[in-house]
C-alpha cells in the first residue's frame, strides 16, 4: 500500500533524493579506468556523510558497503572491492542516502573510457527504457503499462529484462510500495 506523504515529508524525501543524486553524479566523475570500485564506494560514503546523511545501503540486510557497484555483466547489487575498473567497462552504481528519516535511492550506468558499440547500445536502450517508463507512469495507466513500455522497447533491440528485480517506491524505508515491474504483468 502506498502511504500518502505530507508536504514536509515530501520535502524531506526530496532532500534525501537530492543527496543521492549528487552522490550518483560524483560516481559518474569517478568512474574511469584505473580506479577501484572500493575507492568509488569510499568517496560516495564520505560525500553522503558530509551532507549530514547516512548511506542507506550500508548494513542493509547485511550489505557491507555504502553503494552497489556492478561491472559489465554483474546484475545490480555488486559489492565494491579492490577490483580495478578497466577501459571499456560499463559500471552501474546504485546509491542511497537517508536524512530526516527518509531515504533516497538512485542508480545509473557509466562508461569507463571508450566502450564497445554493443555496450553503448545497451546503455542507450536502457536509458530510453527509463524515459518510456516515466512516460507510461500516467494517471489511468496500470503499473503493468509501465513494465510493458520497458520490456517491449528492450525486446525491440534484442535485449531482455532481468525478471528477478523491480523498481520500487521510497520513503521511510528503502523499499516501499509500489513495486514496479520492468515487464508486462497483471498489475
Kindly give the residue locations of the regions a language model identified.
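Active-site neighborhoods and metal-handling regions in enzymes and metal-associated proteins
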Residues: 1-187
Amino acid at each position: 500500500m502506498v502511504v500518502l506523504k505530507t508536504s514536509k515529508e515530501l520535502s524531506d524525501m526530496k532532500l534525501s533524493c537530492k543527496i543521492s543524486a549528487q552522490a550518483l553524479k560524483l560516481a559518474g566523475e569517478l568512474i574511469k579506468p584505473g580506479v577501484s570500485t572500493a575507492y568509488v564506494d569510499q568517496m560516495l560514503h564520505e560525500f553522503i556523510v558530509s551532507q549530514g546523511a547516512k548511506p542507506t545501503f550500508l548494513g542493509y540486510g547485511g550489505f557491507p558497503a555504502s553503494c552497489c557497484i556492478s561491472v559489465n555483466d554483474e546484475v545490480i547489487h555488486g559489492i565494491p572491492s579492490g577490483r580495478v575498473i578497466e577501459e571499456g567497462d560499463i559500471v552501474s552504481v546504485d546509491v542511497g542516502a537517508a536524512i530526516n528519516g527518509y531515504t533516497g535511492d538512485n542508480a545509473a550506468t557509466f562508461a569507463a573510457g571508450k566502450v564497445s558499440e554493443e555496450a553503448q547500445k545497451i546503455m542507450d536502450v536502457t536509458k530510453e527504457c527509463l524515459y518510456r517508463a516515466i512516460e507510461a507512469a500516467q494517471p489511468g495507466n496500470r503499473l503493468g503499462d509501465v513494465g510493458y513500455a520497458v520490456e517491449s522497447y528492450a525486446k525491440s533491440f534484442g535485449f531482455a529484462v532481468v525478471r528477478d528485480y523491480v523498481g520500487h517506491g521510497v520513503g521511510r524505508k528503502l523499499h516501499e510500495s509500489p513495486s514496479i515491474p520492468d515487464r508486462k504483468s497483471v498489475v
